[in-house]
Regions:
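Secretory targeting and sorting signals
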Residues: 1-25
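Functional surface patches built around histidine and acidic residues
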Residues: 21-152
Length: 152
């Protein structure tokens, strides 16, 4: 077994480590994905209430863009913000924001990380934003989360 690992590391290249996936890797069901997304929204609204802000309403339009962008980021392994013009036009919104996260194991940890980042925190607490859509996509053993915020 040691020889196989050595050969694999030599084939991949120096400095890279290759590990085998566990025999039964965790794959969340559609229910756990929906539950993760719902928990992100609930946690964001809890934080907003704590800071005297109104709740955000879950909305199909920012959700549609969160789902498509989250799937793209998870599938490609890339990680960057999309151009907000797409959401502004597609949702007929006057304002839009986006938060991204990858690698956090729970919705609560995801939102806590956003609250520790000034730009992401600003989106969560922005009084002018009224709608939210969230995507949570589990691939390659980790969650990729996209939250899109809009104001019509």
């Amino acid at each position: 077994m040691r020889r196989i690992a050595l050969v694999a590391s030599l084939l991949v290249g120096p400095g890279l480590v290759v590990t085998a996936a566990p025999a039964q890797a965790y794959t969340p069901s559609a229910y756990t994905t929906a539950a993760f997304e719902a928990r992100v929204i609930a946690r964001i609204n809890w934080v907003r209430h704590r800071y005297g802000r109104a709740s955000l309403a879950a909305n199909w339009c920012p959700d549609k863009y969160a789902e498509s962008w989250g799937s793209y980021l998870a599938r490609t392994g890339r990680f960057y913000h999309r151009n907000m013009t797409v959401i502004l036009r597609g949702c007929s919104a006057r304002r839009a924001g986006e938060n991204l996260a990858r690698g956090y194991t729970t919705a609560d940890r995801t939102v806590a990380a956003w609250m520790a980042s000034p730009g992401h925190r600003a989106n969560v607490l922005d009084r002018s934003l009224t709608r939210i859509g969230v995507a949570a996509v589990y691939t390659r053993g980790q969650w990729t989360v996209v939250a899109n915020f809009t104001r019509p």
